[in-house]
Amino acid sequence: EIDKLNKWLFENVNNAVYRAQFAESLQAFADGYETFFTGLDAMEERLADKRFLFGDYVTDSDIRLYTTIARLDVSYSRNIGPCKHRLVDYPNLWGYARDLYQIPAFRHNTYFKDFAASVDLNEADEEYWENTYYDIVVQETDWDTIWKTPTGRESLSKDPAHKFKAEK
């Protein structure tokens, strides 16, 4: 089941946003864009009664979905044009993303400032740094405080004290 969902996530979420972003025709853009947001809609619905994609514990599928949704508002939204929805417009996905962010391995490997940069910051030329969005919005936003806001999603779990099956 995990492998099946991972394949679906790749086709309908993880790669769909890139198909829109790097499309070479309007039709290819529209296909990627619609597939991406339809995929997010499906995940929003799936997470309505589950803490994580397969219930009580984090799986590989959760990691795969998180890597895309963590970038939605700070990166992808600027690269694919007006978005149908922001992450916060999906209450289940937004709470789910923040719930995962509470886990140190997620939090310590989520680099919002890097996600917001449209180039490798180590190779950016001087002109790149004259970027209002990056200089003001990204630098002055307290991402950690926003994302560490409690979610209450533990109430969806039969084992709320544990996020990983191995912790039992």
Regions found by a protein language model. Name each.
Residues E1-K168:
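C-terminal alpha-helical interaction module
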